[in-house]
Swiss-Prot record:
It comes from the Bacteria. Keywords: Bacterial flagellum biogenesis, Chaperone, Cytoplasm, Translation regulation. This is Flagellar assembly factor FliW. It comes from Lachnospira eligens (strain ATCC 27750 / DSM 3376 / VPI C15-48 / C15-B4). Pfam families: FliW. InterPro entries: Flagellar_assembly_factor_FliW, Flagellar_assmbl_FliW_dom_sf. Interacts with translational regulator CsrA and flagellin(s).
Amino acid sequence: MKVQTKWFGEIEVSEDKIITFDKGIIGFEDWKKYTLVYDAEKEENISIIWLQAIDEPTLALPVMKPEFVFETYDPVVEDELLKALGDDIQDDNIRVYCALTVPRDITKMTINLKAPIIVDFDTMKGIQLIADNSEYQVRYPIYDILKKEEN
């Protein structure tokens, strides 16, 4: 299917690449269907990926795998909440992403470690949860970390 986006123009998205968030994403509860937009050739090494809403061209959230900035990232969430992803969750099918905030001054870029976005690529269901870990911040500064990784 063709999806109109503000930032990437018209993109082709196969049905099996659509992630459904039954409850939406925090702050964007009305939009339930998304896809990940990234350079497929650099998938393993790319730090920033875009979570693009299927039905809203202007809604594209920058996200990244938290391990890029926090190697030991291990959010504590209630197992009961994970059931929204499906009955038979396999660790191999799960990917965790965290939303970024990129202000005009990119040196103030932050990652939200407190509310991970969890996707089961077997069921293509996603959920955003609040981690119980007190050490995880909503606005964890990452500019210096990304700059160091770039060099």
